[in-house]
């Protein structure tokens, strides 16, 4: 929950290997808002991961409220209390910025926050 590795897919071979692993592994994957990343995975591989959970959908189910401001499920909104403000400008999301330390920190923090949220929800549901 506090350490992450960020893999930079800076060539087609690595990109292909990682995407193939994502859609073929039997290991359960935890995503927050697979709708976003899943679009890219599906576009490149014409399928989605075999076994995954989406922490955003689960959070929305648990927090559901007619007033959407009372059921916000964005990762930064839900985990900001623990990880602070880690968002970066959308200008950073380009191939030119893939080695930018701020973007790498953002990616690592997103991963840690997703796992932490998943663990918190799982523990809540066990009680």
Task: Report the location of each language-model feature.
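Active-site-proximal helix-loop-helix substrate-binding element of RNase H-like nuclease domains
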Residues: 2-127
């Amino acid at each position: 929950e506090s350490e992450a590795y960020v893999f930079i897919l800076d060539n087609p071979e690595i990109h292909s290997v990682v995407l193939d692993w994502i859609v073929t592994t039997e290991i359960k994957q935890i995503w927050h808002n697979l709708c976003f990343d899943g679009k890219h995975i599906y576009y490149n591989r014409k399928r989605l991961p075999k076994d995954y959970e989406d922490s955003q959908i689960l959070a929305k189910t648990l927090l559901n409220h007619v007033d959407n401001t009372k059921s916000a499920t964005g990762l930064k909104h839900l985990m900001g209390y623990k990880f602070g403000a880690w968002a970066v400008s959308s200008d950073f999301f380009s191939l030119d910025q893939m080695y930018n330390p701020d973007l790498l920190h953002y990616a690592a923090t997103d991963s840690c926050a997703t796992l932490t949220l998943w663990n918190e929800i799982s523990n809540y549901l066990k009680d």
